[in-house]
């Protein structure tokens, strides 16, 4: 297994492209992380929209640059809205990303996510336990937390990517991005990032946005992971704990975009 790495120059170019295109991201995400997710996208130069009403979700999925489906606070009415949005995204060729939160621990959301896979997501982003469960390798995880190392999920991620045609992202101490054949590893970040609710969910939104960019989708998604880890490292250096981390993290994302515009 060969794991490729990406250069800082490539990352900076991709971030410049991201800011230039300013993707409009339809975020059907969970209630806990909506504000943080929106602010993360804004800091990087994207435009978030949290449209969840069933009658509007399908309409908005047709005009958005990208769609995010995050099942963290899934309910039956929300599942209906998500289903409508995904079906419209498929018709409109809007790229969409699935974040299968806690899919290994809860049956209803696992069945729902497996149903959505038939609509061919552009990307899937989860921790090791979630990706392994979605691939049918194992069930588990402690709710939203993983009980497996990211590297252990690489074979499952490759299988899932080949079966669905999606780019699969396994996040952890090292993030891995694969299309079933190529694998890119992204190092960095800090353990403090796991002490703040929503960093993974926000990453999924950035991944969704990157699916709307021109060029190599796998590499663009890998850059999303790199930007988040890079901003996390900068934020931790200025923080005293989780409470002060969040504003420093948003500032760091913003500063990254300003640096590539200079």
Swiss-Prot record:
Binding site for substrate: 50, 198
The enzyme's E.C. designation: 2.7.1.50
GO biological process, alphabetically ordered: thiamine biosynthetic process; thiamine diphosphate biosynthetic process
UniProt entry keywords in alphabetical sequence: ATP-binding, Kinase, Magnesium, Metal-binding, Nucleotide-binding, Thiamine biosynthesis, Transferase
Binding positions (ATP): 125, 171
Catalytic activity from the UniProt record: 5-(2-hydroxyethyl)-4-methylthiazole + ATP = 4-methyl-5-(2-phosphooxyethyl)-thiazole + ADP + H(+)
Example GO molecular function: magnesium ion binding
Keyword Kinase found: yes
Pathway annotation: Cofactor biosynthesis; thiamine diphosphate biosynthesis; 4-methyl-5-(2-phosphoethyl)-thiazole from 5-(2-hydroxyethyl)-4-methylthiazole: step 1/1
Cofactor: Mg(2+)
Xref: HAMAP family: Thz_kinase (MF_00228)
Assigned protein family: Belongs to the Thz kinase family.
Function: Catalyzes the phosphorylation of the hydroxyl group of 4-methyl-5-beta-hydroxyethylthiazole (THZ).
UniProt-recorded name of the protein: Hydroxyethylthiazole kinase
Organism expressing this protein natively: Escherichia coli (strain SMS-3-5 / SECEC)
